[in-house]
Curated annotation (Swiss-Prot):
Subcellular location: Nucleus
Miscellaneous comment as given in the Swiss-Prot or TrEMBL entry: Present with 1860 molecules/cell in log phase SD medium.
Organism: Saccharomyces cerevisiae (strain ATCC 204508 / S288c) (Baker's yeast)
Signal peptide location: none
Residues that bear Phosphothreonine: T17
Protein modification: Diubiquitinated in a cell cycle-regulated manner. Ubiquitination first appears in late G(1) and persists throughout S phase.
Region (Sufficient for nuclear localization): 435-512, 453-553
Protein name, UniProt field: Minichromosome maintenance protein 10
Quaternary context: Self-associates; assembles into large homomultimeric complexes of approximately 800 kDa. Associates with the MCM2-7 complex and the DNA polymerase alpha:primase complex. Interacts with ORC1, ORC2, MCM2, MCM3, CDC54/MCM4, MCM6, CDC47/MCM7, RFA2, CDC45, POL1, PRI2, POL12, SIR2 and SIR3. The diubiquitinated form interacts with POL30/PCNA C-terminus.
Effect of C332G: Abolishes self-association
Classification via InterPro entries: Mcm10 (IPR040184), MCM10_OB (IPR055065), NA-bd_OB-fold (IPR012340), Znf_Mcm10/DnaG (IPR015408)
Residues covered by region (Zinc finger-like): 309-335
One GO cellular component term: chromosome, telomeric region
Amino acid sequence: MNDPREILAVDPYNNITSDEEDEQAIARELEFMERKRQALVERLKRKQEFKKPQDPNFEAIEVPQSPTKNRVKVGSHNATQQGTKFEGSNINEVRLSQLQQQPKPPASTTTYFMEKFQNAKKNEDKQIAKFESMMNARVHTFSTDEKKYVPIITNELESFSNLWVKKRYIPEDDLKRALHEIKILRLGKLFAKIRPPKFQEPEYANWATVGLISHKSDIKFTSSEKPVKFFMFTITDFQHTLDVYIFGKKGVERYYNLRLGDVIAILNPEVLPWRPSGRGNFIKSFNLRISHDFKCILEIGSSRDLGWCPIVNKKTHKKCGSPINISLHKCCDYHREVQFRGTSAKRIELNGGYALGAPTKVDSQPSLYKAKGENGFNIIKGTRKRLSEEEERLKKSSHNFTNSNSAKAFFDEKFQNPDMLANLDNKRRKIIETKKSTALSRELGKIMRRRESSGLEDKSVGERQKMKRTTESALQTGLIQRLGFDPTHGKISQVLKSSVSGSEPKNNLLGKKKTVINDLLHYKKEKVILAPSKNEWFKKRSHREEVWQKHFGSKETKETSDGSASDLEII
């Protein structure tokens, strides 16, 4: 930000001048002054040649001091001849009588309309002639296009763009020679020249705008019937930004290699007004366009102070990336204002009675919010037509904030919602009730699992005896004994223990069964291996070899195989 108290040198390219100060306007003014001088000289000659006769009425005027007696004058012959002599030679009286005798025009005359119409036609012809003469004097390329220069490392202030450069692509003398007869318009001056609502091109035969490249897009194609290549890059002076569109295959191939941070001059670009889609027919701002094949961009040097805003967006987790002047600022204007508001909110003496209200609609943008596009500085707020019902509905649904608390939370990171603090006791009570219900459910689950594990309390004596006989018959098969573990997880022992104890077994068979059951119940194996043993593996291998020798071996060395082996066992 420039300090108004600082005394700076006069910059001729920073002052906004009128369009009449160009060379053609000065030449026309000199021509008009020459014609005026000639007219005045001729008028002076006529005045000198013609001597105005004296009026006899003013030769001798006598004012009587007091009333006198009226006397009858006797006219003489000489006096009559003298009066007739001067009557015909009085030019003033003759001219006055002629003007009085002319008929006056009626009140409803069209003389003013006709004069205005004729003047309009004359002005139009003058504008056409002026435009033709301006186009005849226009050039489309710089005079240094065919020369090749070696970049020069430097650290100086470039006079045409008022930007510091660390490298020059063209010497300063050659640059001044190339831009000698070209009007230089910086971005601030260009926005003052190209004004709404018409956004007409500046009235200069040759003009160029200067700035540094801060953004460059990818190559795209237009959506017309015959697609055309184009790309866009943005130039800036750290205060204003402007988009430049390059159309055409040759232009894209020539200018797509422009580097970010280069200071360039664009000669006589076309002004391209644009309007936002779906927001009426009014023109909002303008861009620049190059659609011809001439080389009209001159690379001056590489900027020294170009940088990017390093502030990270909390939602997207990406850096801001807005171009900044690293010699003056550490972040962009938007984040500087956010930091200023965060700092001023902590100081009571800086807080006013009324704060800047947060936007409730998309169209209402306070000074804190930067426009979404990069031409936010050039917003033209004009009258808009009434929107349709569907557009009004979409407009109402596009709110930035749901309520005022959300807006305050957006501006202040330490903001606490008062509604949340008021309901804090209710939330704490709900959390305690949830913990108690979870503990109660856990205890009830333990009790239910304990009752389901036994399941013999509600059984009758007959049912218990039946379950015992079924369990003993299952144990007699030896399947569970070969497994090496209890698959029922102890339920067999509970069934056998809870059954009715009868008399001692009458025969040895029942005693043996009881002994086997007890051994099985008390049998525990530390490591259970379900894979076949080594002996079983060797038996299978030898059996496989015997079968192979039988069918594919030599007939002399036939070996008899076991009768239990079959051809189906060959893999």
